[in-house]
Amino acid sequence: DKKLDADISPKPTIFLPSVAETNLHKTGTYLCVLEKFFPDVIRVYWKEKKGNTILDSQEGDMLKTNDTYMKFSWLTVPERSMGKEHRCIVKHENNKGGADQEIFFPTIKKVAVSTKPTTCWQDKNDVLQLQFTITSAYYTYLLLLLKSVIYLAIISFSLLRRTSVCCNEKKS
């Protein structure tokens, strides 16, 4: 039922390991999401960039989205392999040119170095300065609110007094 001219080959979206995962667990997880392909027969496996051995990886269930399918696969890399590049290989009958689609992933060490987190508040003095600034702003707004309430009371009193004076003169 698919149009012959429609591109129904797998469209990959890749996700790289987080810095927190690599630092905390000493592993990194590459995720490859394959979307908008038809039919649902697909094979996904992982290899090192310069290797031929198929690595142990995991796959999610096949999901149907509208008239196409979606599948995801992930590879968890141990610390000893973080310096190696990896590739996700996709076999599908509608791949462009009929060849296997290869998605390359950079080394985890490159990812960890290029996404080094920055710390905004490195010093306790900075935290105290921030707390002082917030407290000052709070009291400033509180003072302005109090001033506005007093101003409202004075204006209301003046208008009510003026109205009562005007009304009393007309009755006389």
Curated annotation (Swiss-Prot):
Residues 1-140 are annotated as: C region. The chain crosses the membrane at residues 141-160. The keyword Ribonucleoprotein does not apply. It comes from the Eukaryota. It is found in: Membrane. It is a single-pass membrane protein. Keywords: Immunoglobulin domain, Membrane, Receptor, Transmembrane, Transmembrane helix. One of its GO terms (cellular component) is external side of plasma membrane. Its main location: membrane. Residues 161-172 are cytoplasmic. Pfam families: C1-set. InterPro entries: Ig-like_dom, Ig-like_dom_sf, Ig-like_fold, Ig_C1-set, TRG_var/const_region. PANTHER family: T CELL RECEPTOR GAMMA CONSTANT 1-RELATED (PTHR19256:SF65), T-CELL RECEPTOR GAMMA CHAIN (PTHR19256). This is T-cell receptor gamma chain C region C7.5. It comes from Mus musculus (Mouse).
